[in-house]
Amino acid sequence: MSDRVYLTKDGYNRLRDELTVLKSDVRKEVLEKIAEARAHGDLSENAEYDAAREQQRQLENKIGDLESKLTRATILDPKQVKTDRVYILTSVKLKNLDAQKEEIIEYTLVSSDEADTDLGKISVRSPVGKSLLGKAVGDKVQIQVPKGELHYEILEIFVK
């Protein structure tokens, strides 16, 4: 998998810190669980040992995934992001054209690894993100979501 992973500096640092914790603290805890389970004797019918080994497999997969993402990461500088169109790292103000009263919402488009809907950060790979990418102020967009179709007008594009 050679797809670039676009991250902010904070997003990169957060993933790097998570990897450090997994490789040191969590890996050590899992190895201790395996050693403890081994000490109980017969491994052929040792559910505790099997569970610890499964936890180790999952941990190593997560570590490998994070290492791969960090290797493929391109750190984006918000100061260099254009605001003529919607791109990754731009924020957009949208007017909901379906609402009875005026409803303005704001999203920031980020990578899947940094998405957090509670903070208004949506993935560029989400239905909303895909529909907004490349659009300009004044454009009207239709967005297919599981609940149906949404209609918005782009009011503003900016970088936070």
UniProtKB/Swiss-Prot annotation:
Sequence similarity: Belongs to the GreA/GreB family.
Molecular function via GO: DNA binding; RNA polymerase binding
Biological source species: Chlorobium phaeobacteroides (strain BS1)
Coiled coil, from the record: 43-76
Name of the protein described by the UniProt record: Transcription elongation factor GreA
Function description: Necessary for efficient RNA polymerase transcription elongation past template-encoded arresting sites. The arresting sites in DNA have the property of trapping a certain fraction of elongating RNA polymerases that pass through, resulting in locked ternary complexes. Cleavage of the nascent transcript by cleavage factors such as GreA or GreB allows the resumption of elongation from the new 3'terminus. GreA releases sequences of 2 to 3 nucleotides.
Gene Ontology annotations of biological process type: DNA-templated transcription elongation; regulation of DNA-templated transcription elongation
Gene3D superfamilies from the UniProt entry: Transcription elongation factor, GreA/GreB, C-terminal domain, Transcription elongation factor, GreA/GreB, N-terminal domain
